[in-house]
Amino acid sequence: MPQLDLSWLGLRLETSLPWLLLLLIGASWLLVRVLTQTYIFYRTYQHLCDFPQPPKWNWFLGHLGMITPTEQGLKQVTKLVATYPQGFMTWLGPILPIITLCHPDVIRSVLSASASVALKEVIFYSFLKPWLGDGLLLSDGDKWSCHRRMLTPAFHFNILKPYVKIFNDSTNIMHAKWQDLASGGSARLDMFKNISLMTLDSLQKCVFSFDSNCQEKPSEYISAILELSALVAKRYQQLLLHTDSLYQLTHNGRRFHKACKLVHNFTDAVIQGRRRALPSQHEDDILKAKARSKTLDFIDVLLLTKDEDGKELSDEDIRAEADTFMFEGHDTTASGLSWILYNLARHPEYQERCRQEVRELLRDRESTEIEWDDLAQLPFLTMCIKESLRLHPPVTVISRRCTQDIVLPDGRVIPKGVICIINIFATHHNPTVWPDPEVYDPFRFDPENIKDRSPLAFIPFSAGPRNCIGQTFAMNEMKVALALTLLRFRVLPDDKEPRRKPELILRAEGGLWLRVEPLSTQ
């Protein structure tokens, strides 16, 4: 019988058997892996084929660059949603598929999935990680769930109620500046610049109980936050600088690191100062003292909160949540309020109706301050805010990467691991959901017109388990600022129409410019 001759390998048969067995096992394992990955790829590809695709540039580029962060890109989105009202699939290059959903019936499956199934896809937010850490915006899984439960009391109406006074004060400071600038009859103002400072002023008081007077004089901390936001938006558009090691070598990378350090040092100093005061005061004493001053700030709540096991948040966790609130709370509200004023400037009949509603509310008062109970007494103003958030949502897209297959109501499957975009802008401009979607019509939000509409047709604050925890805070601030603005100023459109610019939030190229006229001069 012929024998296997391995002498040319320098091996004898009896000594080579273990090696042959090991080689066979390794080859079998590799074959199984290859076959498994091939099956997964084939199965994923089959599911992806169920989603319609716009025409590609070519096989290599796919749809890369088809939707740009510009006015033209948003117009392209409105064309796509008119053609594919349920959603569509695109390829970034030859191998990265992205599913975009833009109809309430299909986005429900993703937004209603648990936070452990529909993970936030951080590819669009990863540049914020060195600044915001593992705050609610960027964290996932058990940590996110735990922190969400612990932070929910911070947004209870008992905590939010005293903040209305802060919103009034910060808006008054902004308006005093406007009155000076418009002393000649009117002033042309960049709403983003002015309102961003106002929202940061409010947030610094609500989060830290700190008044930097940033609307009237430069503040290092506030300037650092504005710089960080601008640098992140700029980096997002520079593909070569998406690599951290390369970005750190650039001038902007060094600026980002310096601004990050300044912001962290400020937050850490506040936390450590409050932490040192805690051992000398009982928790009940702190709460009673704060109750007398009628304000419990965000840092207070974070320091006092405990999970189900009585465990407190670490200083690092508190810093991450405070920095996240400062970032998310100023940009989104500034965007929303700026576009609201723009829409009311273009529709003076709605602006005047809002103004009359505010005047009627404050008719018999000596003070023109908006109070907590007033916020529910401004129905038409609220309708105008919501219609502007529909037409110009501050956050235009959110992203998820699911840890398991998600089955849509029509039977199609979003495969595990595929990036899924919930396009808020497209959903809000979907003609099958909103007739004449490009028209600004506040009466869409009349109670009679809301009854038969899906709650997921309007999602400026997202929806489901990962919806915006601060949406009531944001709506309250916008109501106060808008009511006082319309009470004191007439807002007029600029000669030049703004060009929308979707970054982390919806901006306008070169700023959003409007003219304001003090009503006392009319």
From Swiss-Prot:
Please give a single GO biological process term from the UniProt record. omega-hydroxylase P450 pathway
| Swiss-Prot/TrEMBL induction comment | Up-regulated in hepatocytes by pro-inflammatory cytokine IL6 and down-regulated by anti-inflammatory cytokine IL10.
At which positions is heme bound?
Answer: E328, C468
Instruction: Specify the enzyme's EC class, one word.
Output: oxidoreductase
Q: Which reaction does it catalyse?
A: (5Z,8Z,11Z,14Z)-eicosatetraenoate + reduced [NADPH--hemoprotein reductase] + O2 = 20-hydroxy-(5Z,8Z,11Z,14Z)-eicosatetraenoate + oxidized [NADPH--hemoprotein reductase] + H2O + H(+); leukotriene B4 + reduced [NADPH--hemoprotein reductase] + O2 = 20-hydroxy-leukotriene B4 + oxidized [NADPH--hemoprotein reductase] + H2O + H(+); 6-trans-leukotriene B4 + reduced [NADPH--hemoprotein reductase] + O2 = 20-hydroxy-6-trans-leukotriene B4 + oxidized [NADPH--hemoprotein reductase] + H2O + H(+); prostaglandin A1 + reduced [NADPH--hemoprotein reductase] + O2 = 20-hydroxy prostaglandin A1 + oxidized [NADPH--hemoprotein reductase] + H2O + H(+)
Assigned protein family? Belongs to the cytochrome P450 family.
Protein name, per record: Cytochrome P450 4F4
Look up and give the organism this protein is from.
Rattus norvegicus
Q: What is the name of the gene encoding this protein?
A: Cyp4f4
